[in-house]
């Protein structure tokens, strides 16, 4: 019986060899694609996590109508929170695009430079890389913001604008019409004092939860958890 089955199987393979070869080829290609996609996804996830850690990606942000007082900021930092002012002003450029101006970041959502350096003088600026590409801006290029000329000293990105949407409700990124720029504190204050921005300054704070905060959270969780079980 086994001999008959072997002969039949062998005959079937010979008669349909092209079909089985095609099937084997498809299986191999499918396995290759799956392994490639998994490997690529793992690389992207790992790379994103490393960049987030390196450039201090925020744990969250909140917006207020008026800036926090020094006392309020101190109270938050004492609870184990690192705060960063990510206030911004929007300006309309001559080509019709909108440029969102921030101060240089220091502690949270730090600038990831692809080229050049941070702005150190009031006449210098770092431009978001996609906007720079769409507007042919390079290191050493000049850009006019609110009538003043700025020299591009850096090109890069920030983790909170990984996809550079103007609004959270936007469905697509249009770097030809919207971009980011980072200037010194003095340059930012001058732009604010001129009062020529499209709208009033937006007061947004980015924050990171420190180890102290996490320890407090988990200690509270393990104290409360046994009681919740019997609630």
Which residue ranges define each predicted feature?
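Membrane transport/envelope proteins' first extracytoplasmic loop
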Residues: 2-231
């Amino acid at each position: 019986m086994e001999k008959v089955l072997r002969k039949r199987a062998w005959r079937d393979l010979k008669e349909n060899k092209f079909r089985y070869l095609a099937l084997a080829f498809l299986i191999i290609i499918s396995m290759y694609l799956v392994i490639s996609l998994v490997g690529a996804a793992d690389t992207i996830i790992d790379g994103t996590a490393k960049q987030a850690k390196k450039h201090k990606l925020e744990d969250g942000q909140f917006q207020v109508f008026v800036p926090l007082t020094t006392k309020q900021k101190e109270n938050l930092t004492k609870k184990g929170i690192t705060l960063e002012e990510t206030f911004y002003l929007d300006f309309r450029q001559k080509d019709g695009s909108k440029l969102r101006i921030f101060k240089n970041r220091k502690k949270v959502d730090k600038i990831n430079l692809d080229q050049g350096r941070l702005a150190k003088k009031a006449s210098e600026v770092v431009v978001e890389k996609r906007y720079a590409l769409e507007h042919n801006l390079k290191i050493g290029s000049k850009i006019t913001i609110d009538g003043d000329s700025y020299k591009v000293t850096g090109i890069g990105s920030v983790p909170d604008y990984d996809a550079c949407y103007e609004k959270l409700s936007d469905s697509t990124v249009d770097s030809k019409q919207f971009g980011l720029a980072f200037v010194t504190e003095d340059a930012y204050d001058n732009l604010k004092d001129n009062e020529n921005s499209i709208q009033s300054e937006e007061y947004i704070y980015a924050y990171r939860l420190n180890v102290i905060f996490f320890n407090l959270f988990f200690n509270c969780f393990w104290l409360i958890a046994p009681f919740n079980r019997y609630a």
